[in-house]
Amino acid sequence: MLEHFRAGWAKVMNPIADALLRAHVTPDVVTWIGTIGAVLMALICFPQGWLWQGPWLVTLFIFSDSLDGNMARKLGRHSQWGSFLDSTLDRFGDAAIFTGVALYFAGPGNSVLWTAMACAALVFGMATSYVRAKAESLALEAKVGIATRADRLLVSLVAIEITGLARVGAFPHWCVVALPIALCYLTLAGAITVVQRMVAVRRACES
């Protein structure tokens, strides 16, 4: 869903990318800073129950996912290393978000069920990325699916924010169910996406 908005978002990031390049900041540095920042914010904020603050801080660093590629294009660099680094570090950022949520439910959230569901959402999210990466290593394409990385990030961070605001009284208390509902959706959507991509690869292999 959100993949269709990447081109427009890249234009928004252009001025920031230009400013960083003028400051002699490299795309790789932006990638590392973004990943380390997102991981730290997710693993510090979410386990502590800082659910309405955490998503804003994580999102701030996730912006680098658009910036590094934008900067590389402006420099005329389309290196395999840059693509590999970006894709690899993205997995750490994604894992940190769901690990942070699992730790929240294992601590302040006090729910074994939702701790397990957060772990399941993490596993299926990683599986969707692995299936695509493996397919591409075989010169095949597996970008299909109802839950891309951008979709997973949006759903998870918005749900965490809503639950956090409900916990502090900014939203009606029943809105605390937003995060559990999102975990159910992400687990199911992740499983479906894995199947969709496996089917796509199977068909490509047989064609």
Curated annotation (Swiss-Prot):
Subcellular location: Cell membrane
Coiled-coil ranges (or none): none
Active site: residue positions: D90 (proton acceptor)
Entry binding sites for a CDP-1,2-diacyl-sn-glycerol: D28, V29, V30, T31, G69, R73, S79
Enzyme Commission number, as recorded: 2.7.8.-
Gene Ontology MF term list: magnesium ion binding; phosphotransferase activity, for other substituted phosphate groups
Cofactor annotation comment: Contains a di-nuclear catalytic Mg(2+) center.
PROSITE patterns according to UniProt: CDP_ALCOHOL_P_TRANSF
Any matching Pfam family: CDP-OH_P_transf
Binding-site positions, Mg(2+) 2: D65, D86, D90
Residue positions binding Mg(2+) 1: D65, D68, D86
GO biological process: phospholipid biosynthetic process
Transmembrane stretches, start-end: 21-44, 50-67, 88-106, 112-131, 152-170, 176-195
Known catalytic reactions: a CDP-1,2-diacyl-sn-glycerol + 1D-myo-inositol 3-phosphate = a 1,2-diacyl-sn-glycero-3-phospho-(1D-myo-inositol-3-phosphate) + CMP + H(+); 1,2-di-(9Z-octadecenoyl)-sn-glycero-3-cytidine-5'-diphosphate + 1D-myo-inositol 3-phosphate = 1,2-di-(9Z-octadecenoyl)-sn-glycero-3-phospho-(1D-myo-inositol-3-phosphate) + CMP + H(+)
UniProt KW keywords: Cell membrane, Lipid biosynthesis, Lipid metabolism, Magnesium, Membrane, Metal-binding, Phospholipid biosynthesis, Phospholipid metabolism, Transferase, Transmembrane, Transmembrane helix
Quaternary structure and partners: Homodimer.
Family: Belongs to the CDP-alcohol phosphatidyltransferase class-I family.
NCBIfam families referenced in this protein's UniProt entry, alphabetically: PIPSynth
Function statement: Catalyzes the conjugation of the 1'-hydroxyl group of D-myo-inositol-3-phosphate (also named L-myo-inositol-1-phosphate) with a lipid tail of cytidine diphosphate diacylglycerol (CDP-DAG), forming phosphatidylinositol phosphate (PIP) and CMP. PIP is a precursor of phosphatidylinositol (PI) which is an essential lipid required for cell wall formation.
Name under which the protein is recorded: Phosphatidylinositol phosphate synthase
